[in-house]
Amino acid sequence: MKLLISLLWSIFFSIVYSEKTLLNFKHYELCNGIYSKSESGGSLNPAIYVNWTEPWGQEDEVEVLIFNWKEIRKLGAFRSDDQFTYICDYDAVYTDHLCEADQLGLYLWNSTSAKSIRSYIIPTNADPQNIIYEISQSGYYCIWSHSKKMLPYQALVNWQNAYGGLPASQFPRMPISGGITIAYSVILALWMFFRFQYKHSIVTVQKAIMFLLIFSCAQQAVTSIVLDTENLRNRGNFTWLGETLVSILFACQLVLDLALLLILSWGYTRYSTNMRDRLFTEAKIPLIICFFALFVVRFFAITIQSIHLGLWFCFFFLTACISALYILFGAFVALPSTLRALVEQRYYTLHSIYKIFRIMVLCGVVTIFSFSLVALIFCSNTNNNSTNKLWKIRWYFLDGWIDGVHLTYLITLSSLWRPSQENPDLDPTGLSYPVLDPRLEEELDLLEEDIRADKSK
């Protein structure tokens, strides 16, 4: 219990730390993407707000530098010994002649050619003036701060986009989540149309697929509602509860996918106690690990405001991918014996479906493995140079692709097992059930003992 509490506390601390909305003498650099009004639309004026919170009254000056990362090369200068510096110090003034004496302790930057760079010098011996930096062009903006006397200071930074309060890293999720909800609704409507036509011959697999379609449609609808609420209102208790609910539904959805895929690969097309026992015996632990890891991955991805998610996200993402690949590999290994059993018992319609199903499982293994490598590269890379180019699509390569894989998976299953006149051929009885029947195993053991006894005589 203590270990679990420590783990949960570490996760919470990582989330709070990764938010990085406080600017102070320890975290003197903040970077984030922000959209312009012309690109994202909306009624608000996009801007970066820096509101000072630390008590003042000390003799000091704090310089705040805000700029678009594209102009990073216009900051700093080389010394005479080829060392690069961003701050005007005594050597920069009297030895290298890079700045004037009245610029001591300030940032070095090219004020003649810079377009987005703004410098704000805040005296701390009085009530400091809050900073408003207006955004006219979408980009990856950074805030650098520096105290001349290295005294403590603190400010709260708000990255205000024109469309609302949703962070720029989460903005693409909102329309795409709504689009996926519509896609699930269309698939579900078509499925219900075929189901109504052949309602008297619906088999168990088709009922499971219909449940997954309804569950996925509801999950995406809840995600859209939570994101829209967070965009219209400030973050509060409802937002945290909504993000937790979205993460739980997301993890449940994918665990149900993996469980159904594994059950079908074993050849079970209807519920039985043998199927349940086999699932609990062979896949219970991987499914539980996958559920917890997927919950944390989605919760981190939609909760953390910063572009950089941290090492905890990488750890849980890797755990989720490994457990999912383990289950998929087990399904792929079990499929050849299922295909042979289908041929032996002359279930040719189901055999043709399972051949396509095997290709789908193999494609799932390759897709998850490939996207996992790309996501880990994105997650572990905290270089601002690369983030500046990829901050708009970074969300997709981290965890957004999982929704696309799930949508493709459900479309394929719905197409293969769609209700039709061949419904009875899609649910053979006795295909794999006797394999793990304990009574049959006892009879086989007794038969083997009798054979050994006869041979010994």
From Swiss-Prot:
The keyword Kinase does not apply. Its main location: endoplasmic reticulum. GO terms for molecular function: signaling receptor activity. The chain crosses the membrane at residues 174-194, 208-228, 244-264, 285-305, 315-335, 359-379. It is a multi-pass membrane protein. InterPro entries: GOST_TM, GPR107/GPR108-like, PTM1-like_N. One of its GO terms (biological process) is cell surface receptor signaling pathway. Keywords: Endoplasmic reticulum, Membrane, Receptor, Signal, Transmembrane, Transmembrane helix. Residues 19-173, 229-243, 306-314, 380-457 are lumenal. Residues 1-18 form the signal peptide. One of its GO terms (cellular component) is cytosol. The keyword Secreted does not apply. Residues 195-207, 265-284, 336-358 are cytoplasmic. It holds the Pfam family PTM1-like_N. It is found in: Endoplasmic reticulum membrane. PANTHER family: GH17801P, LUNG SEVEN TRANSMEMBRANE RECEPTOR. Belongs to the LU7TM family. This is Uncharacterized membrane protein C18A7.02c. The lineage of its organism: Eukaryota, Fungi, Dikarya, Ascomycota, Taphrinomycotina.
